Every structure is written in C-alpha cells, then in structure tokens.
Amino acid sequence: LELGNNAIGYVAAWNTEYAETCSGINAFTLGVQSVNPDATVYVNQISTWGDEAKEKAAAQALIDTYNVCVIAQHCDSAQPQLCAQDNGIFGCGYNSDMTEQAPNSHITAAIWHWNVYYQTAIETAMTCGDPANFVTAMGGAAYYAGLAENFVDTSALNEATAAPNTAAVMDAVRALIVSGEWDVFSGVKLSYDIAEDGTVTVNKTDAPLMTNDGTEIVAAGGPSVDDGVITGSMNYNVEGVVVS
C-alpha cells in the first residue's frame, strides 16, 4: 500500500499439481488481500523443486512484466530475495530466514521448527511399545502440525524493511489462528485498524471464498476448507491469483 503498487510476485516450484504448493499460494494471497484488498498475486511457476537459475529468472520476469513491489516464493534458495534486493523492492522468503542474504529486501519467511517433530517422534518411539504401533501413535503416516504446536512459524521480522505495526498485526492474527477462532480458508476475511498508539483491531467480515475463475468454494461465513483438501487435493487458485 505504501508503495502505491497492487502487484505482488510469487515464484512457485509448482502450483495446482501439488496441494502443498497450491495451498501455499492461496494462503499467501488471502493474507495479502487482508492488508490490500486490491492486490493481485502474479505466480511464475518454474516446474521444479529446486533450480537457482530458474528461481532468479522467474523473479526477474515478474518484476519486468508486472512491476511487482514484493517477491514471495515457494522454493528453497534465496535467489528470488536477492533479485528483489537487486531491484530495490521487498520480499518474503521460504523455508529459512533469508534476511542475512538479502537484508535490504527480505521481510520475513515461513519456517518450520523441525525440533518439534523430532522430539515428538523420539518420545513416541520410546513410549509406543511395539515399533509397529509407531505410525498409528504419531497420528498417521503423514505428520501435520501448525502454529499452535510451534512447528510452523515465521522468521524474525526484519525491522529494517517491515512497515510500522507489522509485528502487532501478525501477532493478532497468529492469536486468532492458534485459538481456532479463525482460519485463512474460511468464509471470513480479515482487515485491520491500527490506533495511534499501535493497538491493532482485527475486523472479521463474512465473505465467500472464491476461485480465480469465479467458483464459490466456501459460502460467506462458512467453515474452513477441510484439512484433507488443503493438504491433499486442493487444485485451484483463489480470486486474486494470476498465473503467468
């Protein structure tokens, strides 16, 4: 908003081919729209899990084509963040804190505290008895945890690049997610009011969750998309996503 630019770039390893990447793109877009309802997220897919040259080229193409003011990503290297820094714009990383590599552009990144999983797995292995019981005791073959378990997190906010009151807004939304009061894939959208003293008020508005082709996924005020869809079968992009 401060940049007067509604264009956001996103370098994606994949998109609707995998629920992991698709849900990440969608969740990021919905978060962006809570701050700037007029924002469009332009996705450039590189069709590989890792290729630093392609990641950098995809970021540069988003900048050149759409004049994006932020580069986000679902790929592991810091090349998109370095490209953002080279072009004087901002960025959000993935998998690790990329502020050290791009201190003048990087804001924060989605990260995972793997020690949470390792501790859970080791303690379960020690107490489940027969090793054949391990998978069942862990809750299934796939392990899922989130903010409430401190497995999913965001890296330390780079105060040199973050807008004022960003931390307060993030903390307020985190509290809603952890408490179960709100979910990003529900039929409820968020917006924020910030008082002069920095106090954040989160506003919740019933609104349908729509795809970018106009299909309604969740009715206004409706419950979140099922976890199994988010983690296993989500194959659409939400309204506001443009795939380049």
Residue ranges of model-derived segments:
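A residue-level marker of the well-folded mature domains of exported/periplasmic proteins
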Residues: 1-244
